[in-house]
Amino acid sequence: MRRIALAALAVLAVSALSAPTATAAEGWQPVGSDRARPLDESQGLASVERDGQTTFRYTGVGTIDPALAVQGWNHIGDPGAGDGYYVEPYQRDDRGAKLYRVEAPDGSRANYTHELESWEAPNNSFAAVSPDARWLVTGEWGTMDRLLVLPMPGVAMTDPDANLPYASSIQLDRPVRDVQGCDFVSATSLLCSSDDPEGSLFGTTKPLLQVDLSAPVGDEDVTGTVTSHGQLPLESACSGEFETEGVDYDERDGTLRVVVLSPGVCLVSDSKTWRLQRG
């Protein structure tokens, strides 16, 4: 996952001759947007429901826990939430492990580490909590034909000192590229944002993907059928390369939120969290 460098905030100029306008992902229509701050709202978001109240928690460079940063955990991905639990995925530059910072419904926190399998990429792009809050789906960077499934830390695994083990995988029927975030829509369906810059896999860059599962995730592999809903909204006063980030599906009203970072200096001024609903 491409990181937000602080140097990007000091870029002096960028071409704004042909500002792209928002497009609609097929089947999903933009209904509004909010400015996404690049320091603390640039990696993703999760809707956390507790005691009948829903709050939106964002991640970015500025939300990295300082205590974890000094230990080398220098990147945070798209968070996930379910049943009052909130999970932040962390990665570091070595291949030692991945870390999941879990906040329980009572506000207590614990850190769980997952030792990499021999074949596993070190990237920790996102965390998606299954509807029953028993499993955690997570993803790697690059071109992949799988998503990974772990026991839900804090629920199915309650010892932070023990390794959070690999449980199973979602075997995709076609490859995906640079998936930045996923969230469950139902027990057998996820929506995912792809930052694919090439467009060769689904006929467009930056697609919104749907993954339909053969069965709910668990300790056995399941298959996932991937379809594209087209390109996510790209709109900025600047032209250049956008970066799609994490997603959240709000079950209350069926709103999908996705963070899209603008090119160049517009990263600061008009990056957005888009709100989409089924058209």
Task: Describe each region flagged by the PLM.
Residues 1-24:
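Secretory targeting and sorting signals
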Residues 33-40, 68-72, 114-121, 170-175, ...:
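Surface loop/turn motifs at the tips and blade-to-blade linkers of beta-strand repeat domains
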Residues 42-47, 76-78, 126, 179-181, ...:
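Conserved beta-strand position repeated once per blade in WD40 beta-propeller domains
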Residues 55, 63-67, 94-102, 143-153, ...:
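Structural motif
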Residues 62-97, 111-117:
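Blade-loop segments of beta-propeller domains
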Residues 174-225:
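Loop/turn-rich, solvent-exposed surfaces of beta-rich toroidal or solenoidal domains
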Residues 219-251:
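Conserved blade-ending motifs and adjacent loop-strand segments that build the rim/top face
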